[in-house]
């Protein structure tokens, strides 16, 4: 069903924050869950601590802007979501030059 459950209570969907760390203890991934579904902000870092990804969820559905960065800290992509539907994106190269911009027609 796509939900995350607590290990000690298999019949209860997990509500809380899941944190994954690199071997040195620094943050790799942080995701908030509500009733087993991603809810709120998700962040992922590169091993050097630089931000790699930020996304926002509303009860398992992507909303707003999902951003990704190159390892050098330059923005790589901004993907736009509304109620789980992909709207469009902008892409940049490693130097920060915008290389693509697309918008999906809404029905």
Map each language-model feature to its residues:
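Glycine/tyrosine- and acidic-biased, solvent-exposed loop/turn segments at the edges of beta-strands
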Residues: 1-107
